[in-house]
Regions:
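Active-site neighborhoods of divalent-metal-dependent phosphate/nucleic-acid chemistry enzymes
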Residues: 70-131, 153
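Generic secondary-structure boundary/loop-capping signal
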Residues: 10-11, 120, 143
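Short, catalytically relevant binding-site loops at active-site mouths
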Residues: 10, 49-52, 80-82
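Residues at the C-termini of beta-strands that transition into short coil/loop
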Residues: 47, 77, 147-150
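Short secondary-structure boundary segments
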Residues: 7, 47, 118-120
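A structural micro-motif
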Residues: 41, 71, 113, 142-144
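Short, C-terminally biased terminal segments at protein or domain edges
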Residues: 140-157
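Short, well-structured N-terminal submotif of metal-dependent ribonuclease cores
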Residues: 1-45, 54-65, 71, 89-95, ...
């Protein structure tokens, strides 16, 4: 599969161990997928992801960027920005989720198979995905699957 990796994935990979049992499980599943499954896929990211990943604690930012370095960088073109604007203007995502809109737009415009995320608020959210899918179809695109690493584990096992 051709998969877009957004910022939450490297963030979970380098984060300090969570105390919350759900977050701890998500960290472990993400590590397992990254170690065992990523090699079976073509992974992509964008400059927007690199900018997000490079912010914050210097050591963690460096570790995130190191994980993302081998991934192919997709262009954030005018078409990507226009599609992201439609997501925001349509109220599908709130104005402060402009980077999340850009992640969806990048994966959609570049016709990838999936967008890998652990952002349950704005991306891995069935009701939001329904609206995103309608918009994508109206604009002549197929929305990539927006899913967690766990959803892609069966591809390899």
């Amino acid at each position: 599969m051709r998969i877009f990796v957004e910022t939450t994935i490297p963030s979970y990979l380098v984060a300090r161990p969570a105390r919350d049992v759900v977050q701890m499980a998500r960290q472990q599943i993400t590590r397992d997928w990254w170690e065992r499954c990523r090699g079976a896929h073509e992974l992509f990211t964008s400059q927007i992801v690199l900018d997000e990943a490079g912010a914050g604690d210097a050591a963690l930012a460096s570790a995130r960027l190191e994980l993302l370095a081998p991934l192919e960088l997709l262009e954030v073109s005018d078409s990507v920005l226009a599609f992201a604007r439609k997501i925001l203007d349509g109220g599908i995502l709130p104005p402060d989720a402009d980077r999340d809109a850009a992640h969806v737009a990048t994966a959609t415009i570049h016709r990838l198979d999936a967008l890998l995320s652990l952002n349950f608020r704005h991306l891995v959210n069935a009701s939001i995905q329904t609206c995103l899918r309608r918009l994508a179809l109206r604009e002549g695109y197929d929305l990539p699957a927006i899913c967690t690493p766990e959803a892609l584990m069966d591809d390899i096992q």
